[in-house]
Amino acid sequence: MKNIAKKDLFINNEIRVREVRLIGLDGEQLGIKPLAQAQAIADDANVDLVLIQPQATPPVARIMDYGKFKFEYQKKQKEQRKKQSVVTIKEVRLSPVIDKGDFETKLRNGRKFLEKGNKVKVSIRFKGRMITHKEIGAKVLADFAEATQDIAIIEQRAKMDGRQMFMQLAPIPDKK
């Protein structure tokens, strides 16, 4: 009953089977009953008869307050959506020959992303003959990682991919 959507449930007069395995209000088994008798029991208790497992033989029906059940189900779904956190990866692009002022600006942007709880992909694109000096790019990435070590951990070390070197930083869990 945990992942039941409205389209899966048949209620009261929507049920089109001859007999059902009936479950009472408190979850007790009431046995196999003809549909008319099961609906009469539900009507006497002023609640709904809900078909919860139509594929079973015989189908399983439960006596419950459907409005309350639906409300509780929606409430649980809402809570689960609240608990989900969407982790986005923001990218900061650098150059191997980046100037100090530009580096500070990119660093400030990267820190903002990390403080908001986002992961940051720091990438360096090598153009032309710069690719022969990969150590310069590695130093720039190391400087970036060192400058953010108080709020971030290195999730993926510096790595080459074609003409691009990148690393990924994640915020320290308790600093979110």
Swiss-Prot record:
GO aspect biological process, one term: ribosome disassembly
InterPro entries: T_IF-3_C_sf, T_IF-3_N_sf, Translation_initiation_fac3_CS, Translation_initiation_fac_3, Translation_initiation_fac_3_C, Translation_initiation_fac_3_N
Gene Ontology MF, one: ribosome binding
Entry's Gene Ontology cellular component terms: cytosol; membrane
Top-rank taxon: Bacteria
Subcellular location: Cytoplasm
Subunit structure, interactors included: Monomer.
Protein name: Translation initiation factor IF-3
Native species: Streptococcus mutans serotype c (strain ATCC 700610 / UA159)
